[in-house]
């Protein structure tokens, strides 16, 4: 019986599954919005929420320890860790949780897998990127 098991295995070994969580987490932190399958988004949400909470709590108390802990969880991506500690930790300083949302977005063309958009709550909509002419 699978009582109390909170995560999916995705038919992958543990190391692959952990890197499969770390890579989209880094992309989500960098771009603040990603497109993925619904199952992966539901598994990614608690992982990212914990990262933001750790960054939020340790940004002021012990920034060196927080930076090292986040680097180990996020595959050593320093740019994403810096953004998490400098931008996202300040943005969600007074928010007790619930930093992400999952919006269902139809089905993938190739295999009809349900697709979702995962994004941070309270994110600023950026200016549209200008296309270089010429």
Curated annotation (Swiss-Prot):
It comes from the Bacteria. Keywords: Ribonucleoprotein, Ribosomal protein. GO terms for molecular function: structural constituent of ribosome. GO terms for cellular component: cytosolic large ribosomal subunit. GO terms for biological process: translation. Part of the 50S ribosomal subunit. Contacts protein L32. HAMAP family: Ribosomal_bL17. Belongs to the bacterial ribosomal protein bL17 family. This is Large ribosomal subunit protein bL17. It comes from Anaplasma marginale (strain St. Maries).
């Amino acid at each position: 019986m699978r009582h109390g098991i909170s995560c999916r295995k995705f038919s992958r070994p543990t190391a692959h599954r952990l890197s499969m969580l770390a890579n989209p987490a880094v992309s989500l932190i960098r771009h603040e919005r990603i497109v993925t399958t619904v199952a992966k988004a539901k598994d990614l949400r608690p992982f990212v929420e914990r990262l933001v909470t750790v960054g939020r709590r340790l940004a002021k108390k012990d920034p060196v320890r927080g930076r090292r802990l986040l680097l180990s969880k996020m595959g050593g991506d320093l740019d994403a860790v810096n953004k998490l500690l400098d931008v996202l930790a300040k943005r969600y300083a007074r928010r007790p949780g619930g930093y992400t949302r999952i919006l269902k977005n139809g089905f993938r063309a190739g295999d009809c897998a349900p697709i979702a958009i995962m994004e941070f709550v309270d994110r600023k909509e950026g200016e549209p990127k200008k296309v270089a002419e010429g």
